[in-house]
Amino acid sequence: MSEPVLSSLRIEPLNPSHLARCRVIAESGALPRFQAVLIGDWLARFEQRFPDLLPSRSPRCLVALDEDQLLATVVARPYNRRGTCWTLQLPELSGETSRHSLRDVQHDLLLEALQLGAPQVCSWVIRCPASDADAIALMRELGFQPLRPYQSWLPPQPSASPSSLRGIDPLSWLPITRRTAQLLWPIEQVGNFSHLRQITDRHWLDLLDRNAPGCGVLVDGETVLAGCICLTESSDHGTFELLRDVAWDPRLEQALPVVLGRVLQQGALRSLITAFDDAPLSRVLEAQGWTRGGEQLLLGRSMWRRHVAHRNLQLSRSLDDVFGRLRPQGSPLPNPSLGPRCLGPR
C-alpha cells in the first residue's frame, strides 16, 4: 500500500507550469521571486554547459510534486564563479497537505539537488539555524559536516541622518571595487581554516558578486579595518555579513556605528551576520541597539578527491639496477704491475 504513495512524489526543475498551478506562491507574493529564479535556472544551464566561457552566477531551482500539487521548493546557487562550490537553501515548504512526511519530501528534494551540475560541482555548503536540530540532522544524513558558527543580529531603527567619518581621519568608507575587493580578501579568508577554504574554493573576484547597496570597505589608506558584504546564498533576503581584521582597532568603536548607520540607510538590511566568538564587536553592536538573533551554523559537504601521487617506476629501481650500468660488460683489463719491469734480455 505504501509503494503508490512513495512513487507519486516527483522532483522536477522549476518550469512556468508550476508557477501557474501553485496557488500558494501567488497568494504569498513570492511570484516575482520565483519568476526571477526561473529565468536564472535557464541561464544556469548554459553556464554549466560552458564553464570555461561563462562564470557561474545563476541559481537552479527544483520542486517536489505530489501529482499536480507543489509541496516544496529548493534553490541552489553558485558559491564561486568557478562553479566548483554551490550553496543550498533549506527547502521552502508550500504549506499544502500531503501524504508524504515533510522529512521525506525535504530529503528527496535535497538529494536530487546535490546531483545538479555533477561532476563539475565538487562541494556544497548550507546555512542552518543552530537551534533547528531536525534540519542539522537531515544535512548530516546527507553527508554535511559543521564548518563554522555565526552570530545573527537584528538591526535597530535607523537614524534619520547617519554620522560622518570626518572626525575619524584618515578612515574612509569605500564601495566594493576590484581594488577594494583585493584589499578585503585577506580579511575574508583569515577567519576560515584551510579545510573550509578548500571546500569553498573561492577567489577575490567572488567578492564582487557579493556587492549590494550599502556594502563597502572601511580603509585607512591601503589597510582594511572592516568590510560589509551581502550574503546572496542566504534564504533570508537582506542578510549582510560584517568582516573585520583579526587585530581589534580601537577606532572601530567610533567608526562601526557610522558604517552600520550607512548600511541601514542605503541597503535593505534585515539581519547582520558576524563571527560567533567576536566579543569586542558584540559589545559595539549591543551598545548601538542591535539585538542578538539566533546562532547559525555553516555546514559543508566536499567531494574533492585527494590526489595520490603515483610512484615513479623510473625512480623506484633498485641500486643494483642503477649501478649495474657502471659494471664492465667485457673481460676486465689486467691491472698494471708496480714491480720492476723486464724490457728484454740482459
Feature map (PLM): residue ranges:
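Structural motif
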Residues: 14, 74-75, 91, 127-130, ...
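Conserved acetyl-CoA-binding loop-helix of GNAT-fold acetyltransferases
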Residues: 98-115, 141, 249-264
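Conserved acetyl-CoA binding element of GNAT-fold acetyltransferases
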Residues: 83-101, 235-250
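Active-site/acyl-donor-binding loops of N-acyltransferases
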Residues: 2, 129-131, 141-164, 271-346
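Conserved GNAT acetyl-CoA-binding A-motif
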Residues: 86, 117-129, 265-277
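Short, structured motif recognition centered on aromatic/hydrophobic residues
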Residues: 61-62, 85-89, 110-114, 124-125, ...
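Amide-forming acyltransferase catalytic core, primarily the GNAT-like/NAT-type
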Residues: 3-76, 141-238
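Intrinsically disordered, low-complexity segments enriched in Gly and acidic/Ser/Thr residues
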Residues: 221-271
